[in-house]
């Protein structure tokens, strides 16, 4: 082995040791703060996104009791990630799918992604299975749906309807919000009109938001006979063309 190869091997080994040492500090809430900050700075200046970004993402996995220090460190990690630009997107997306702590990863993606990429990311992180017994997954679905309402969804509306059956009322409500923020389509109305007819206590908020949407946008009731049977909401009457109108 030549001298230059030995030097390169020594430098690579030293760099690997530095990565491992600093990575331990980044995600250790009990580390000396100066050591953790120095570790964040180390990865912020690292040129390889496949080394720097996964390490910096770990800083979002815990919070410090001292809110100011916590915010500063997370902002520093945030800036260290977004400086890699588009190269950061697939790495952060993979992390987002695996974690239940999504606030900062979503902020990163919102900064770097186009609206279409943001929609694709959010839809790709939803869990469409029954997660009613998993509080972390339930909360994650709720948070993602709350973000998704600001974007045009790409999945078939029928797939979003899965969340209308969720046990958690927050999930049902957030799914309705996503659907009513989409451009008007009969398929959307067909999915949510059931809540216009639903006066049950567990769906009070959903009934109200759907009613407000029908009134605001003058949507036609698709099944007026069912609404009459269930009871036209107090203070409104149903016109002959199927539009709910406030009583004067």
Model-derived features: where do they sit?
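Terminal, low-structured helical/coil segments at or just beyond the last alpha-helical repeat
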Residues: 224-248
């Amino acid at each position: 082995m030549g001298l230059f190869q030995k030097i390169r091997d020594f430098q690579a080994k030293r760099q690997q040791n530095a990565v491992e040492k600093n990575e331990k500090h980044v995600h250790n809430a009990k580390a000396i703060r100066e050591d953790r900050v120095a570790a964040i700075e180390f990865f912020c200046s690292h040129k390889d996104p496949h080394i720097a970004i996964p390490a910096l993402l770990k800083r979002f996995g815990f919070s410090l009791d001292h809110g100011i220090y916590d915010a500063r460190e997370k902002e520093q990690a945030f800036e260290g990630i977004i400086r890699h630009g588009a190269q950061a997107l697939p790495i952060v997306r993979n992390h987002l799918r695996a974690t239940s702590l999504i606030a900062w990863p979503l902020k990163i993606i919102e900064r770097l992604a186009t609206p279409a990429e943001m929609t694709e990311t959010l839809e790709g992180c939803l869990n469409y299975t029954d997660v009613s017994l998993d509080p972390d997954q339930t909360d994650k679905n709720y948070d993602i749906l709350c973000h998704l309402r600001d974007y045009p969804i790409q999945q078939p509306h029928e797939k979003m309807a899965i969340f209308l059956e969720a046990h958690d009322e927050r999930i049902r409500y957030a799914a309705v919000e996503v659907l009513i923020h989409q451009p008007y389509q009969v398929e959307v109305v067909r999915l949510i009109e059931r809540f216009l007819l639903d006066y049950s206590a567990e769906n009070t908020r959903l009934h109200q938001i759907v009613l407000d949407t029908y009134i605001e946008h003058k949507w036609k009731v698709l099944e007026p006979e069912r609404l009459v049977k269930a009871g036209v909401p107090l203070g409104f009457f149903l016109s002959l063309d199927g539009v709910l109108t406030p009583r004067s």
